[in-house]
Amino acid sequence: MAHQTGIHATPELKEFFAKARNGSIRLIKVVIEEEQLVLGSHKELKHAWEQDYDALIVPLLDESQPCYILYRLDSQNAQGYEWIFLSWSPDHSPVRLKMLYAATRATVKKEFGGGHIKDEIFGTLKEDVALSGYKKHVSLCAAPAPLTAAERELQEIKINEVKTEISVESKQQTLQGLSFPLRPEAEEAILLLKQKKINYIQLRLDLEKETVDLVHTKHTEIKDLPGRIPQDTARYHFFLYKHSHEGDHLESVVFIYSMPGYKCSIKERMLYSSCKNRLLDSVEQDFQLEIAKKIEIEDGAELTDEFLYDEVHPKQHAFKQAFAKPKGPAGKRGQKRLIKGPGENGEDS
């Protein structure tokens, strides 16, 4: 879970939330001021939600200031109207603000009422949270629940008596292509790592909610890495490996998949193994984060400076050519001599 900041909504904002949830308010903008959540602005209903969406939301997005936006849909559930929760964290905003807003996001949802929120979007660019971005998000979320697919596959494995070992050493994945969505906190951490504003990310799978969650982004030196690896559960790690190679200073992102063998359940091992490739595809393609090396380990003790260096810069084994017979001295050479062994001329030894 994200670290909580102790910031809460003002009484005025709480009162406005209660009024807005089932009233004629289409949009609520919430900002942090003086360590409190306050009402930034609001907009009334004008047209159907799709018509209002871009016209009301986009003008409120400041290029250097994060904010939260709650946008009311026209659909309802048992608790009332359904809302979209947008977390806006532009690239040009200060890192301190980004982290503050990321850590307070859960509080905003709780104060408003999580049961009213149908969808949640995180964006750093306007196209991320525009109507087209929201529809793309809905389309991705409409895929079959990954965990259900996993359970079906697991059942098929049992029926067909497939007895393939599932472990860190096994390169064959029984489940192909499972994809748990990244939580907004995890997405923001990846963006910060790409900008080299943090140097370490630890992610976990929430097997019940079927999401990839952020564990923490504590500053990590190489000597700290072994202690970051849990001994009883799997994790995904991204580490900005700073080192020198052939006289150049390099900063290489290394992905580490830690799986402590059979201390984890079969289900956990299967899901971590199956979600790994889709997670990496997303990080490399959607976030354009270049990963220099992907490593799988069982024990954090493996993560030494020498180990990382050899993984990122594997030793090149030169091709061994057959020994070439040296050429003789230049100039006139004597006649060739044929040396025969004893008995080869028909003589006795």
Curated annotation (Swiss-Prot):
Residues 321-349 are annotated as: Disordered. One of its GO terms (molecular function) is actin monomer binding. Residues 4-139, 177-313 form the ADF-H domain. GO terms for cellular component: actin filament; cytoplasm; myofibril; perinuclear region of cytoplasm. One of its GO terms (biological process) is barbed-end actin filament capping. Keywords: Actin-binding, Cytoplasm, Cytoskeleton, Repeat. SUPFAM superfamilies: Actin depolymerizing proteins (SSF55753). The keyword Cytoplasm applies. The keyword Repeat applies. It holds the Pfam family Cofilin_ADF. InterPro entries: ADF-H, ADF-H/Gelsolin-like_dom_sf, Twinfilin. Transmembrane segments: none annotated. It is found in: Cytoplasm, Cytoskeleton; Cytoplasm, Perinuclear region. Actin-binding protein involved in motile and morphological processes. Inhibits actin polymerization, likely by sequestering G-actin. Belongs to the actin-binding proteins ADF family. Twinfilin subfamily. Interacts with G-actin; ADP-actin form and capping protein (CP). This is Twinfilin-2-A. The gene is twf2-a.
